Each structure stands twice: as C-alpha cells, then as structure tokens.
C-alpha cells in the first residue's frame, strides 16, 4: 500500500513498485484512508509519507497500521530530522527512504521488507 498525499508522487511510487515486481493493493492520500485500506486489503507493507497533508501524521498512521493490522512501514521523507526519526522508530519501521526517491534505495527497502515474509509482498 502507498500512503502519500501528493498524487503525482504516489503515481511515481506505484510505477516504481510495480516495475520491481510487486503489487500495489491501494493508494491512500491520508492517514484515515490508509487505516481503512489496511482493513480492507491487508497489505504486507506500506510506503508511508512521514508528513501527510491535512494535519495527518504518517508516523501516527504507521502506529495504527502496526497495532491494528500488523502492517510495517517504509517511511518516506524529504526532511527527516532526528526527533522525527526517533518517533518513527517507535513503530518498528522496515526502513527509511529519503525524497526525492532513488529507485535503487526503494528497491532495497522493499527487499528488506520481503525477507521476513518469504512470500510475495503486496503493497
């Protein structure tokens, strides 16, 4: 699942992820959508923007996804300060990927997410 409030970035992420051979089950533009989609689609992992629009926090959403649905996140951010990173670490992230996204770093993060699953990863 992709959780990104900027539609063009979300579309770019979907192209990258599917190009790496993964399936994207849903794209959410807010924390509330992410939680609803997680209940409906049960993704293995979520690409989560740290700062979502409309006052949504990607970190808080990640906590809910982990607690309610056991979905771990790969955090995406253009500006990840130490305090934000520390807050995100409390939610057992798979990895952090800086924006702008370098495809090879995203691919490595997805591979890291796959290792414990030992099956196809659905985003």
Predicted regions and their residues:
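Two-component/phosphorelay signaling modules centered on CheY-like receiver
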Residues: 6-26
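Hydrophobic/aromatic residues positioned on beta-strands within the core alpha/beta folds
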Residues: 76-77
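Alpha4 helix (beta4-alpha4-beta5 surface) of REC/receiver domains from two-component response regulators
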Residues: 80-98, 108
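Acidic catalytic/metal-coordinating carboxylates
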Residues: 30, 56-60
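C-terminal output helix
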Residues: 83, 101-111, 118
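Short amphipathic alpha-helix used as the core "switch/output" element in two-component signaling
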Residues: 59-71
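Active-site residues of response regulator receiver
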Residues: 49-51
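Acidic, metal-coordinating helix/loop segments flanking the phosphotransfer/catalytic sites
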Residues: 27-45
């Amino acid at each position: 699942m992709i959780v990104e409030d900027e539609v063009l970035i979300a579309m770019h992420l979907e192209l990258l992820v599917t190009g790496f051979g993964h399936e994207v089950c849903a794209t959410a533009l807010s924390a509330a959508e992410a939680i609803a989609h997680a209940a409906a689609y049960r993704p293995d992992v979520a690409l989560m923007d740290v700062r979502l629009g409309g006052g949504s926090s990607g970190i808080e959403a990640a906590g809910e996804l982990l607690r309610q649905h056991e979905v771990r996140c790969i955090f995406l951010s253009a500006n990840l300060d130490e305090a934000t990173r520390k807050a995100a670490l409390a939610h057992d992230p798979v990895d952090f990927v800086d924006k702008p996204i370098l495809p090879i770093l995203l691919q490595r993060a997805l591979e890291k997410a796959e290792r414990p699953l030992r099956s196809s990863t659905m985003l």
